[in-house]
Amino acid sequence: MNLLDRRNFLTLTAAAGVAGASRLRAQTAKPLRGIFPIMHTPFTEDDKVDFDVLVKQAHYLHRTGVHGMVWPQLASEWASLRSEERFRGAEALVKVSNGLSPALVLGMQAPTIDEAVEYARHAERLGPDAIIAIPQTGVTDNHKLFEYYKAIGNACKRPFFVQALGGMTAEFIVEMSKAIPTLRYVKDEAGPPLPKLSFYRERHPEFHPFTGNNGKTLYEEMLRGSAGTMPGSQMPELYVEAWNLFHAGKRRQAAEMCMRTTWFLPVYETYGMAGTKYIMVLRGVFKNYLSRGGKPNVPKNGTPLDEEAKRNIKEMLDQLKPWLRA
């Protein structure tokens, strides 16, 4: 789809229903704090995005008690999505999320600044609770990254998360925020998160730092003042319970729940997105565990998701059922 076609598409999607959803959202701002799972992208057997299941996933996340939801990002396999799929998915999620409790954060990242700006303008029309952007594909130069993020921030005035990766420093993100007033949130996966949390807390309390990496160090992250974390969508109740217990002063119970969140980390690393989506199948949300191309996405050095692996994942999931709501 060329730029002119995309602009025409944006005009068509700014229909009365979407505009009405945007006005309603502007009147009911939701807090940007807590557990914000990254939504996974469901595909049909004929390799199309299953938008009905994407919406079903939003309802599922609402039932688990999460504070927010994010799409599309790395765990959404965003790079495999076509622009029209991202536009349509964003519209579907904005529409459904107005009746749900979690805040909605939409991803703006793209290979080029022009494309990212189109997504940002589309988001400005839709009015999600916030936006987020992974660094521009293949770009590591700080000046170029600044221009990319500034262009997104100029095109959409919603609260803005930067996804920090690679060599992006906390100091660089703070410097960017001086020119991007909406940039007050960061999901920091650029190296170990714990020192970054202390940096923001002690030197830039106006920032709201989130973490990722499936909350591997969630308990200490909360001790250091994390504003939230963005795990996958497979078992978000565990993270929600850990967060709520910790902030209710029930530290021992929170620590126990944090240990449960880490039990499945080897499964994600071994079976990759195929294992992640298979859990979504077991939870009754997804119809299959396919990725783009009509086949499961397993890491190059991972283990095939064979029948034995599926039996073992189900056995492990069964052990956690007492703590799962949805």
Which role does the model predict for each range below?
Residues 38, 226, 234, 238-326:
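C-terminal alpha-helical cap/extension of soluble enzyme domains
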